[in-house]
Regions:
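Active-site-proximal beta-alpha core segment in soluble small-molecule metabolic enzymes
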Residues: 1-172
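Conserved active-site and cofactor/substrate-binding residues in soluble primary-metabolism enzymes
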Residues: 7, 72, 111-114, 118, ...
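Short acidic, glycine/proline-rich loop/turn micro-motifs
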Residues: 101-105, 184-189
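Glycine-rich beta-strand-to-loop/alpha-helix junction loops that act as flexible
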Residues: 138-139, 173-182, 225-229
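Short, electropositive alpha-helical surface patch
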Residues: 144-158, 188-200, 233-243, 372-374
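Alpha-helix-loop-beta-strand connector modules within alpha/beta enzyme cores
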Residues: 155-157, 161, 199-214
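Conserved "cap/hinge" positions at secondary-structure junctions
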Residues: 183-184, 319
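Charged (often Lys/Glu-rich) extended helix/loop segments that serve as interaction or gating elements
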Residues: 205-207, 211-374
């Protein structure tokens, strides 16, 4: 299932839907985007802790898969279904100890302390709800394939317990996402490409755990992955320009560029690869790479070795396809257009550059504030 929060530009989402991906969403905004993109309601997985009653009603009407995150959501959904004679296909999110710390236990129902089984019992006591899946999401940028194997094994144990007690088959296991891209984490001594597992490694760990869990062959659950970063990060590039070169008080070279953390949110945790876009000096120097924003935290790279750049030189930032176009912000500068390059090399503008008119569209000024003298 394509993770909408990773990059929800319509053109990007439709690329993955054309390849057969369902939609995985965590808000009604993303949910409606998926519907408008042509995804059938039954192929939308509705995750997240913030589902209102109105959100749940829409998901029920469209026969979507509702992943219940907490008891309040469970009770709210159960009451609505019972009062209105509706049916819903549901799953629960399960958090668990996989040996990775800190543990992501703020979402879902805990495996070890019995919360997950208690939630399952409550669901199975409501004939209006059909428990069809089990879901987990154990972390982000996960480098341990063994953690996925442990998570898969624990979900399998729950699925077998459901079968034994209620004679009900869990139709799918959703292992969530968190698969790493080749970006390098800040503070890492090794490049990301040297330490991340391959998708084959992730697949081997997960599928081996499921195949070895003891399911009858004809009752193996469907495996769902909520892939985002690992699929789109590599495909995204940010193009920018050098606007100034200066020396800091300690003598370090500083290069100021026309893109900042407002556009490159992931620079807070990645040391993005940056390269010149033209023939450049053979000499190089360590430098700080600053964005143009009027705040001291606008740092793209705290230390990077690059050729000696000049004002007007162009740069390319690599692997920016994940989370930057959903977490970017309009601050000081307006956001640029986004271009998709087709398989035949044809460029397509898939999001236009913002303008002052764009930003004012949702503003309203009271009449008494429209006249003043300075």
């Amino acid at each position: 299932a394509w993770s909408y929060k990773t990059n929800y530009l319509d053109a990007v989402c439709k690329v993955f839907h054309q390849e057969g991906s369902w939609a995985e969403v965590v808000s009604i905004f993303e949910y409606k985007k998926a519907l408008e993109n042509g995804v059938p309601g039954s192929r939308i997985i509705f995750n997240g802790p913030d589902k209102t009653l109105d959100d749940l009603k829409i998901a029920v009407e469209n026969e979507s898969l509702i992943h219940i995150d907490h008891s309040d959501e469970l009770y709210m959904l159960a009451e609505y279904l019972k009062s209105n004679g509706k049916q819903a296909k549901v799953a629960i999110r399960v958090n668990m100890d996989t040996g990775i710390y800190p543990m992501w236990d703020r979402f879902g129902f805990n495996y070890e302390n019995g919360q997950a089984w208690s939630a399952i019992n409550k669901i199975c006591a409501h004939p209006e709800m059909e428990l069809v899946g089990l879901h987990c999401h154990i972390g982000t940028y996960m480098l341990s394939t063994q953690a996925y194997a442990i998570a898969a094994s624990k979900l399998c144990e729950l699925a077998k317990a459901v079968k034994q007690r209620y004679d009900a088959r869990i139709q799918y296991l959703d292992m969530g996402g968190g698969f790493a891209s080749a970006n390098t984490l800040r503070g890492s001594y090794l490049n990301g490409s040297d330490v991340i597992p391959s998708m084959d490694d992730y697949a081997e760990a997960i599928t081996s755990a499921i195949l070895n869990a003891g399911f009858p062959v004809d009752e193996l659950p469907r495996l769902i992955l909520e892939t985002g970063r690992a699929l789109i990060d590599e495909a995204g590039y940010l193009l920018g320009t050098v606007i100034a070169i200066k020396r800091l008080s300690d003598g370090r070279r500083a290069t100021v560029v026309d893109f900042g953390v407002n556009l490159l949110f992931t620079s807070f945790w990645y040391n993005h690869r940056v390269s010149p876009a033209q023939e450049i000096s053979s000499q190089s120097e360590d430098m700080v790479l600053y964005g143009p924003l009027c705040m001291n935290i606008d740092v793209i790279r705290e230390q990077i070795t690059l050729p000696l750049l000049n004002r007007g030189d162009n740069l390319v930032v690599h692997r920016v396809g994940a989370y930057n176009m959903t977490q970017w912000m309009q601050f000081i500068q307006m956001r640029p257009k986004v271009v998709m390059i087709g398989m035949d090399g044809t460029p397509h503008v898939i999001r236009e550059h913002e303008s002052v008119e764009t930003m004012r569209r949702y503003e309203a000024t009271p009449d008494h504030l429209n006249q003043f003298e300075l």
